[in-house]
């Protein structure tokens, strides 16, 4: 009886879930790292893609995964961006993509596996979901997903020869995604 009830509730929950398409023009994947301990360097990955399946009423995520194009890194400094693409940092030639795949969602936390430079580590992102929303211009249903977390760049072999005094070990990750119901 308990199993039947559990599967019924699971089925009802999934019945309201729907896929969403990320509106890349109104979305971003940011990072921030300390530079010489006192200043922050912010950057963005201009090219990314992802998959979202969510229940807009309960604001629960069923699927959340994405990929970034490492070559698209942009800190508004070409020399620095070119250096970040080298083997010393992201090694974009050998590892052209980074990825994240959710393993669990609960209580506003996205648990998942982040892969950078061929290294996969568990990461937890604090999430805020606003849904269901309606675009006042085209009347389409959409959602806004904001998530942030922190990683240690050295765990992924990124800039491992640079001390924390030059490039901070801790990197803040920030996602701001606008996505439309399919």
For the regions a language model picked out, list residue spans one by one.
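Sec-dependent N-terminal signal peptides
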Residues: 4-13
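Low-complexity, acidic/polar, glycine-enriched regions of mature
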Residues: 17-182
């Amino acid at each position: 009886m308990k199993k039947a009830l559990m599967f019924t509730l699971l089925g009802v929950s999934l019945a309201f879930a729907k896929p969403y398409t990320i509106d890349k023009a109104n979305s971003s994947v940011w990072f921030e790292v300390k530079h010489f301990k006192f200043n922050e360097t912010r950057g963005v990955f201009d090219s990314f893609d992802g998959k979202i399946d969510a229940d807009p009423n309960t604001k629960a995520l069923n699927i959340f995964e994405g990929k970034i194009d490492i070559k698209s890194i942009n800190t508004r400094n070409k020399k620095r961006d070119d250096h970040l693409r080298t083997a010393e940092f992201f090694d974009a030639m050998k590892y052209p993509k980074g990825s994240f795949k959710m393993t669990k969602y609960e209580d506003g936390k996205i648990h998942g596996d982040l892969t950078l430079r061929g290294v996969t580590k568990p990461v937890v992102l604090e999430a805020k979901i606003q849904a269901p929303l309606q675009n006042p211009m085209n009347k389409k249903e959409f959602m806004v997903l904001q998530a942030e977390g922190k990683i240690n760049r050295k765990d992924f072999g990124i800039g491992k020869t640079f001390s924390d005094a030059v490039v901070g070990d801790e990197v803040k990750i920030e996602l701001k995604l606008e996505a439309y119901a399919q």
